[in-house]
From Swiss-Prot:
Part of the 30S ribosomal subunit. Keywords: Chloroplast, Plastid, Ribonucleoprotein, Ribosomal protein, RNA-binding, rRNA-binding. This is Small ribosomal subunit protein uS11c. Gene3D superfamilies: Ribosomal protein S11. It comes from the Eukaryota. Belongs to the universal ribosomal protein uS11 family. Its main location: plastid. GO terms for biological process: translation. The gene is rps11. The keyword Ribonucleoprotein applies.
Amino acid sequence: MARQIKRAANKKKKTAPTGVAHIQSTFNNTIVTITTVTGETVSWASSGAIGFKGAKKGTPFAAQIAAEKASKEAMSQGMKKAEVLVNGPGAGRETAVRALQAAGLEITLIRDITPVPHNGCRPPKKRRV
């Protein structure tokens, strides 16, 4: 007979009512991480973790689904308000912010923290299709 493995049920922690939503949007993927003000991760989701593969991970729709999933999980743990920090040049930036708002999180601040070089590294060569 196969022995049953005993698993501890995931404990739902009650978090602070305010937090920070970090949206990292690259050309290939979008990662949404919701943390407390002190920086402890409450929930996260990414386009790839949801099940999108290849070029579909970089789409605005994939970013929307990822943001909805992360915000629902954070709200189930007691979060109500969030600041939004957006990072990166990807297509899913605005869509992810709208999805957080539509899911019911009250957004208090939107800040773009994309690093801009003072003429640093040479950019990749232009694509010839």
